[in-house]
Regions:
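Contiguous segments within soluble domain cores/interaction surfaces
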Residues: 13-120
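Sec-dependent N-terminal signal peptides
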Residues: 4-12
């Protein structure tokens, strides 16, 4: 493996990875979300996580006020209440601070039950 490929693999291993699980709360367009953060194959603990959302199909028309996530019960788990403006595809923006500073964008389709991952 050459030096550039090795450096790239090290950087990618240290880049935070996130998964999102959102369930409808029973209120219109309100979801209870669980974010799982990993870094280098290990749970990312001690992060300050802010979750926001933008609707890609309507730039600057629908933007959700960011909410601060709270630590969950498992390592790398964070929970937040996400209040959207309508159903459809949303770009979920995770801002991370603390042991790592980064921003992750996840694309999800929200319906009346919850959220499903989408490709950007």
């Amino acid at each position: 493996m050459d030096k550039a490929a090795l450096l790239l693999s090290v950087l990618l291993a240290q880049t935070p990875q996130a998964s999102l699980d959102c369930k409808a709360s029973g209120e219109d367009f309100v979801y209870e979300c669980t974010v799982m953060l990993m870094r280098g194959g290990q749970p990312l603990e001690g992060a300050e996580v802010t979750i926001g959302a933008d609707m890609p199909s309507m730039p600057m028309a629908h933007s959700v006020k960011p909410a601060k996530a709270r630590p969950g019960t498992r390592p790398g788990e964070y929970k937040a209440r996400l209040e959207l403006e309508m159903l459809g595809e949303w770009a979920i923006r995770l801002r991370l601070a603390g042991p790592v500073r980064d921003q992750l964008i996840l694309h999800y389709e929200f319906d009346g039950k919850g959220a499903t991952p989408r490709k950007p």
